[in-house]
């Protein structure tokens, strides 16, 4: 592993050279409280952006163990961090100038679903973090503009990392809400079968979406209320008692489109 000063010196050395000189930056660099890894360098400024990752030791990130020891809670925390990091990157994306995709900073943008993603991973034993994202290495035409990349790696990115990947910089209540909600959801999934159910819809849910291409709930929609004959309840670890409609196998069917 090399130091951040070695990366800075390398960038100064290749400045104004032809774009393939950026290939020399591949490798890992110690930035003190995190490691920057340049995993893949794009072939030219108009190609798919370079692949970069940030590695933060659990001892530095300092997330409490109860946020990552259980898989469902860990995935929820990773989802939360990915969204936070994405917002930070969006704030500084294209502040570094150049041709093509120069200055782009982006991470995969999750929908409303909380899923396991390679873009953000946390070790279950120590809480080590890995964030994977894209950077458009700056150029003037097809000539290296290392001064702009230096801004990204030494000014913009450190701010994004410090504001989104360290527990002390985050809203503690929001992080725990995300983890607690995920654990409650997993509790329901784990206890459906013992009640002879395949799905559950909570009372007060908003089921209609605002459009066929949107995941957002419809405004002013009538909240769902379970029919008395299908009501079931669960006592969740964090939210307490919740009531709604339990769906049994006999109520599950597929609706196929009619072919004229």
Where are these regions (language model features)?
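N-terminal pre-Walker A segment at the start of P-loop NTPase domains
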Residues: 210-239
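Structured core elements
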Residues: 53, 132-134, 199-201, 231-235, ...
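Conserved structured core elements
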Residues: 75, 151, 228, 241-245
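An acidic- and aromatic-residue-enriched active-site/binding cleft used to recognize and process polar
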Residues: 203-205, 239, 250
